């Protein structure tokens, strides 16, 4: 058993435009090399494009809906039992759900062709909002893996 105390979670203040903690975490994930102002410009620009294309009045609500659609419920974790490694399906913790969804959205937005991250991010958010695209496919693949390995669910720890 560990003798150390659990690490304290940092409290992140909300972003300056919408006051949302979730959006500020998303901005932090988009940020590269400590350039937060550029990350903010990219995210706010993408949100404006996203809201304009879908005809939403509040881009934050649409963003939260898109993020909710991308969150995985189950995932598989490797568990070694007697020389064999099993992929054990486990439920994803709420913080990890949103973290994984953000990572997947950003990863697929960066992999889109073209130079402008703002446009790629807006397109990926639109796809998530409409429950389609690469991020949703990744979520479905994760769920499919968990479903396929349901037989090993009794190895949970």
UniProtKB/Swiss-Prot annotation:
The keyword Plastid does not apply. GO terms for molecular function: rRNA binding; structural constituent of ribosome; tRNA binding. CDD domains: uS7_Bacteria. GO terms for biological process: translation. The keyword Iron-sulfur does not apply. One of the primary rRNA binding proteins, it binds directly to 16S rRNA where it nucleates assembly of the head domain of the 30S subunit. Is located at the subunit interface close to the decoding center, probably blocks exit of the E-site tRNA. Part of the 30S ribosomal subunit. Contacts proteins S9 and S11. This is Small ribosomal subunit protein uS7. It comes from Chlamydia muridarum (strain MoPn / Nigg). The gene is rpsG.
